[in-house]
Structures are given as C-alpha cells and as structure tokens.
Curated annotation (Swiss-Prot):
Residues given in the record as a ubiquinone binding sites: 201
Protein origin, superkingdom: Eukaryota
Entry protein name: Cytochrome b
Functional summary from the UniProt entry: Component of the ubiquinol-cytochrome c reductase complex (complex III or cytochrome b-c1 complex) that is part of the mitochondrial respiratory chain. The b-c1 complex mediates electron transfer from ubiquinol to cytochrome c. Contributes to the generation of a proton gradient across the mitochondrial membrane that is then used for ATP synthesis.
Subcellular location: Mitochondrion inner membrane
Positions contributing to heme b b566 binding: 97, 196
Gene3D superfamilies (UniProt xref): Cytochrome Bc1 Complex, Chain C (1.20.810.10)
Annotated family: Belongs to the cytochrome b family.
GO biological process: mitochondrial electron transport, ubiquinol to cytochrome c
Subunit structure: The cytochrome bc1 complex contains 11 subunits: 3 respiratory subunits (MT-CYB, CYC1 and UQCRFS1), 2 core proteins (UQCRC1 and UQCRC2) and 6 low-molecular weight proteins (UQCRH/QCR6, UQCRB/QCR7, UQCRQ/QCR8, UQCR10/QCR9, UQCR11/QCR10 and a cleavage product of UQCRFS1). This cytochrome bc1 complex then forms a dimer.
Disulphide bond pairs: none
GO molecular function per UniProt: metal ion binding; ubiquinol-cytochrome-c reductase activity
Coiled-coil boundaries: none
Length: 379
C-alpha cells in the first residue's frame, strides 16, 4: 500500500514541495531566507488579524484605537510591536533573499525571478499602506508625500491622485481604503508566493556554484527542514530581542504625535527599509524624473537576466564581480543613510553621487566586470 503522504491529493502537494523534494546537497544558509519570508508572512497575517479586531479605520479614532490596543488589550502591546518590527524583519529577509539571487545568478530562472520582483513591489505597497494606519504625523505626511508623487504622471496625474485619495486630500476615505488594501494584500502575497514556489520547483533550486546539481541531490526532509527550523529560531530570537528590548528603535518618534494636516514635521521620511529608494527619489531635482528613478531603482531587477554577460552563472569563482557586488551593497547602505538625513549640504551631493553610482554599477560596471573575467579566462 502506498504511503498516504504520497497518494492523498493534498498531502502529495505538500510532500513534493517540503518532504521528498530533491534539493542540492550544498546550498548554504543564504538559501534559508525563502522559508524565513514564509514565516514572516504567516506571522504578519496572524498579528495583523488580531490587531484588526481592535483597530478602527476612521481618522477620528485610528490613533486612539492603536493606543487602546497598546494600553488596554491583553498583550496588545506585544502584538502591535511584533507586527511593526515583523515588517522590519520581513524586509531584512527580503533584501538578503534578493541579494543572494543577484550574487549566485538565481535570476536565470526567469519566471521565478519575475514573480519575485512582483512580490517585492507588492510587499513594499503593503508595508507603505500599513505605515499609514496608526494615523500619526509621519503616517499622514508620508501618505501625502508618496501619493502626491503620482501627480507627476503627465495628463492623468492630478485626477489619479484625487481618485486614490477619494477626495482633495488624504482624509477619511484614504485611511479606510488603505486599511482595506492592507488587509487583502498579504493574502495576494501568499498566493503569489505559492506561484513563486511552483515555478522554482519546475527547475529545482540553484546552488552556490551555479553548476547543475542534478547528479547530487538529497531529500528536503530531514536535512533542510531542520536547517529551516534553526533559521526560524534565529529569526524569532532577533525579532523578540527587538520587540522586548527596543520596540521603537526602528520607528519614528513623530508617529507618536496624532496626525495634524496643519503642521508639517521638520523631516518627512519613510521607514528605514524604504530610505534607499527615497534617497534616489530626492536626488533628482525634477518631480517626474525622481518618480521614474524611484520606480526604476526596483524595476531594474527585471533587467538582471539581460545584463548577465558572464559565462558562469554564480559569482562564487568571479572575484572582480564579487568586488562590484559588495560595492553595490555598500552603495545601498550609503543611500539608506542619506535617505534619513535632511536635504542640505553635503548630503545632497552624496545622495546624487550614490544614486548615479547605483545605476552605473548595475547597468555598466557589473556587466563589464563579467566580460573582463570572460577574457581573463580566455572564454
């Protein structure tokens, strides 16, 4: 008799994805982030669900309802901070996951990579709308500034912004619809993640060498299930350290002031995980140009398979490309720092140089480094 795990229609799917899946024998801890992102998503949906039970999406009561959750609801404070800091952990895992894909050439799995880029955009949209919900000063002004960027679109811009606002400014209608979207999007993300996994399992995982691992596979369970559990424990440890010891470390103090349309905060800035893109947006003195650079800074990931000029897939044996990759990482950290600084000298010029460097590295320097390596190896 066949094992139910292999014959039952539902169990069979789980079995083929998480138990009997043939996996490369040499995938490193950089391959842990996929499962960690899944855990982050489940955690965010669960904490978000419990927050939604007590939250009210009305401009008059939104801020007070969040305060009520923290003060009066049993363990409401920990649920709220797990949700807020869970978003930070989510983005740390996301950026590590994307970085791994860039370093090891995983973007050659076209469908998986493109779904991944769509997922990245969706998660960013969800996080942005979630940040608006507590209706603090930074929530309100962040929503105003970012939605206003759409007015840079020629001809339809202004109408589009007012349509998104549901009025002539960010108000009740905006908050209500943002709450609705923020609630529904994680489920869309979960569906997209399943498609992401479906496409990945068509090809099998990449590995650090970038060479086909068909000749050397091991079952996912127990080898990678235990490895994923270790990763999950470390993730939860890091998250709970943040939540219990420094819950407001990554937040903005301005968001503890209720939203006031009549008073603009001195420095409007998004959460830390958007600062690199915000720095690129601010570095261009033209509104439409800035918006285009902002979108392209993420959309450029779609071009990665086209920009791959090396004869090797992974950067494991390519020192020059490794050098370029880590310069790109340093550049992104510089942009993140600049995004949180005021718009004044010398930050403006540093931001502009870092923005130029970002696009130059991806579009010119990295493909050139790959070609030089090909020539050095006489390929």
């Amino acid at each position: 008799m066949t094992n139910i795990r292999k014959s039952h229609p539902l169990m069979k799917i789980v079995n083929n994805a998480f138990i009997d899946l043939p996996a490369p024998s040499n995938i490193s801890s950089w391959w842990n982030f996929g499962s960690l992102l899944g855990i982050c998503l489940i955690l965010q949906i669960l904490t978000g669900l419990f927050l939604a039970m007590h939250y009210t999406s009305d401009t008059m009561t939104a801020f007070a309802s969040v305060t009520h959750i923290c003060r009066d609801v049993n363990y409401g404070w920990i649920i709220r901070y797990m949700h807020a800091n869970g978003a930070s952990m989510f983005f740390i895992c996301l950026y590590m996951h994307v970085g791994r894909g860039l370093y090891y050439g995983s973007y050659t799995f076209l469908e998986t990579w493109n779904i991944g880029v769509i997922l990245l955009f969706t998660v960013m949209a969800t996080a942005f709308m979630g940040y608006v919900l507590p209706w603090g000063q930074m929530s309100f002004w962040g929503a105003t500034v970012i939605t206003n960027l759409l007015s840079a679109i020629p001809y339809i811009g202004t109408n589009l912004v007012e349509w998104i606002w549901g009025g002539f400014s960010v108000d009740k209608a905006t908050l209500t619809r943002f709450f609705a979207f923020h609630f529904i999007l994680p489920f869309i993300i979960a569906a997209l993640a399943m498609i992401h996994l479906l496409f990945l399992h068509e090809t099998g995982s990449n590995n650090p060498t970038g060479i086909s691992s068909d000749a050397d596979k091991i079952p996912f369970h127990p080898y990678y299930t235990i490895k994923d559990i270790l990763g999950a424990l470390l993730l939860i440890l890091a998250l709970m350290m943040l939540v219990l010891f420094a819950p407001d470390l990554l937040g903005d103090p301005d968001n503890y002031t209720p939203a006031n349309p009549l008073s603009t905060p001195p420095h409007i800035k998004p959460e830390w995980y958007f600062l690199f893109a915000y720095a690129i947006l601010r570095s261009i003195p033209n509104k439409l140009g800035g918006v285009m650079a902002l979108v392209l800074s993420i959309l450029i990931l779609i071009l990665m398979p086209l920009l791959h000029t090396s004869k090797q897939r992974s950067m494991m044996f390519r020192p020059l490309s490794q050098c370029m990759f880590w310069i790109l990482v340093a550049n992104l950290l510089t942009l993140t720092w600049i995004g949180g600084q005021p718009v004044e000298h010398p930050y403006i010029i540093i931001g502009q140089l870092a923005s130029i460097m970002y696009f130059l590295l991806i579009l010119v320097l990295m493909p050139t480094a790959s070609m030089i390596e090909n020539n050095l190896l006489k390929w």
